[in-house]
């Protein structure tokens, strides 16, 4: 999961495996495979960075035997 911030400042944790698309239309909208959409403060680039960092941690753990 990745931590993001709703426009009202409240944190939200999203399962990055369920992200279908991320778009910017004034605000950043994360659409999930469930059909739900979440508005967040983070930019598309920041969301991408967090997803990549999360996946790297997961795959590194799998390969190191942790």
Task: For the regions a language model picked out, list residue spans one by one.
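Eukaryotic intrinsically disordered, low-complexity regulatory linkers and tails enriched in Ser/Thr/Pro
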Residues: 1-66
């Amino acid at each position: 999961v990745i931590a993001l911030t709703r426009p009202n400042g409240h944190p939200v944790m999203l399962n990055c495996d369920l992200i279908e698309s991320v778009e910017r239309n004034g605000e950043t909208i994360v659409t999930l495979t469930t059909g739900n959409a979440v508005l967040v403060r983070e930019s598309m680039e920041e969301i991408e960075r967090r997803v990549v960092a999360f996946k790297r941690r997961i795959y590194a753990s799998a390969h190191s035997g942790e």
